[in-house]
Amino acid sequence: MMDNSTESVEDAVSLPDFDNPSFYVNRELSWMAFNQRVLEEALSRDEHPLLERIKFISIFSSNLDEFFMIRVAGLEDQYEAGVQDRSIDGMTPAEQLEKIREGVTAQFIQRDACFYGDICPELARHGIEFVDYRSFSESNKEVLQQYFRHEIFPVLTPLAFDTGHPFPFVSNLSLNLAIELEDLEHQSMKFARVKVPSILPRILRLDLIDGLDFGDDRIRLLWLDDFISHHLEQLFPLMRIVQAYPFRVIRDADIEIEEDEAGDLLETIEQGIRSRRYGKVVRLDVTPDMPESIRLLLIKHLEVSSRNVYEIPGALGLSSLMELMRIDKPELKDEPFAPSNPIEEKAGGDIFSAIRQSDHLFYHPYDSFQPVVDLINQAARDPQVLSIKQTLYRVGSNSPIVQALMHAVEEGKQVAVLVELKARFDEENNIVWARALENVGAHVVYGLVGLKTHAKLTMIVRREHDKLKRYLHLGTGNYNPATAKIYTDYSFLTANEILSEDVSELFNALTGYSRHTAYRKLIVSPLNTRKRIIAMIEREIEWHKKEGNGRIVMKMNALVDRKTIKALYLASAAGVQVDLIVRGICCLVPGIEGVSHNIRVISVIGRFLEHSRAYYFRNGGMDELFLGSADIMPRNLDHRVEVLFPVLDSELINVVKSELELILSDNVKAWQMNADGTYSKVVDQRPAVNSQSVFLQQASMKKSISKFKVNGL
């Protein structure tokens, strides 16, 4: 199922050398620029409520951890192997690692200055403060000593390091205390390590601990590692605690699976998850006050390069700040909103009846994800439904979708589910659901060898008037109601016969030995996504030569594929107007005269994570629009099962066109990519347009997306 096309999009006219490294942005540095934009949301004092700014610091920090676990780990492997191959922009692995360290160091400084210098004082003004244990009264310290003894002490494990005790294993993402001790009996110095338990909250809320009295109702917060460090004498009696120094470890967490050699994929992935714990250390976070002797000891025994040691003056592991979102201070958070539910409002909740009447397109989170959940629930209960087939990639830990599928099996339906076990960092969760589905009798498969199944597909077969009718859900996002509240994605419900035939054939390929490749409407990776996208770009060039008004609009999470970028450069050189909405990585450089001067790239970072993918071509006035799961990256085009599906109804095409135009008009949350590869906030003289806020306003007015007014395109 590989796309072996050898597109020659450069042959039509004489053009610059599109392999020139200056025409591309480094993938890793582009990702870091994206994470910088996430950090900027925390830095912006007037654009988010206070706790939401803290949330962005947490997201930035969590993103960066994952970046090191996967991308930096891969570069480290190349560097250690002496690889000198250059990236798309001409950099060696060593040069990329140097740039990453330089950028991350600067970002840490920005993040900590924002949190400690700006956000913490603002929290204090709202009655929330991080406090110093040493400032407490003796009576409060006594209460906390008892609290430590009963609630913290039992789950701590002090680990010594000496000739009789090997250096303790330090797990990935763990926060630890490196402790200097003096053995008073033998008058010698000792070293020990205590892991800060991840099973406990990282941030203690002192206002929730009985017996403490501070004389007011302020919310006082204490870092758990700080709290533990003040009670270490309970762990090491007859020892003098010299000092405790926090440190944090990030390990290589990529799982390499030789699927051709795997007897049982599920067991192989379980083994991979276990081995992930022992990946090499790719980042060591320490505080500046850690003595050189302890730092060198950690570097030696963790086998980490000194270039991968980062000094962080404040608390380590700020991804844990997400815990503060539990604080009940509505005035410090985004206002809640109720998404519209067009099916419920228009068809009284009978989803099959609604789909028979017309196709339905939902734009989450502004439109509720509940109709998708209701579709599976209704199918599970409906005696006329014979079978349900579905792909699952990331479904969450408490999934109503999976519960509905299990209920459908119990109701006698034939249920076939492709559970993608290789969904990174969701492997364990997906294994649990795969086994649960198997245990109730569902047909569970794990996909195709060598490919991740990332497509979002559901097919329901129902008996109607002595005939079988198929109903489809096709989406751009996961079957996860929790993320559907914070990710922007499309859901498409249809009973279109041609699409149903295509989806049926695709499920046969996924679950059986079908080698069907001739899909009539769907674009499927790794068969032909790159080929079809490039063909539509080339077609737009031909239309532009005839009519002079070629237009391409693409919205995606990442644009990395060199062949597609070259095709877009060719379109720009031919005069086609190209607008790209790329949330994250973008290796294409806009604004280069004679190459990309007709290309505009924006990235929208706001309250919701922009996750939908849309590919629009004017096509000489015969608009063509595809939605789906695929970004324009080699992994999506060559190594995953992805689906792009056409929107065939002209009214729904106009809906998406208007939404794309609104996003392109954003001058509040949009960042524009410059010709040097940097990003700057969109600044113009128009009235302020925050596209996500406009969509929220429309949802609050109970407007269906089918009523959105077309503006432009």
Swiss-Prot record:
A GO molecular function annotation here is: polyphosphate kinase activity
In this chain, Mg(2+) is annotated as bound at 394, 424
Q: Name one GO cellular component term.
A: polyphosphate kinase complex
Record SUPFAM superfamilies? Phospholipase D/nuclease, PHP14-like, PPK N-terminal domain-like
Q: Keyword ATP-binding, does the record have it? A: yes
Q: Which residues are annotated as active site?
A: 454
**Which modifications occur after translation, per UniProt?**
An intermediate of this reaction is the autophosphorylated ppk in which a phosphate is covalently linked to a histidine residue through a N-P bond.
Where does the source fall among the domains of life? Bacteria
Write down the CDD domains for this protein, in alphabetical order: PLDc_PaPPK1_C1_like, PLDc_PaPPK1_C2_like
From the UniProt record, give one GO term of the biological process aspect. polyphosphate biosynthetic process
The UniProt record gives the binding positions of ATP as: 63, 487, 583, 611
State its cofactor. Answer: Mg(2+)
Q: Which InterPro entries match?
A: PP_kinase, PP_kinase_C_1, PP_kinase_middle, PP_kinase_middle_dom_sf, PPK_C_dom2, PPK_N_dom, PPK_N_dom_sf
- Which residues are the signal sequence here? none
Catalysis performed (reactions): [phosphate](n) + ATP = [phosphate](n+1) + ADP
Keyword annotations for this protein? ATP-binding, Kinase, Magnesium, Metal-binding, Nucleotide-binding, Phosphoprotein, Transferase
Biological function = Catalyzes the reversible transfer of the terminal phosphate of ATP to form a long-chain polyphosphate (polyP).
Which PANTHER family does this one have? POLYPHOSPHATE KINASE
Name the protein family: Belongs to the polyphosphate kinase 1 (PPK1) family.
Q: What is this protein called?
A: Polyphosphate kinase
Question: Organism source for this protein?
Answer: Prosthecochloris aestuarii (strain DSM 271 / SK 413)
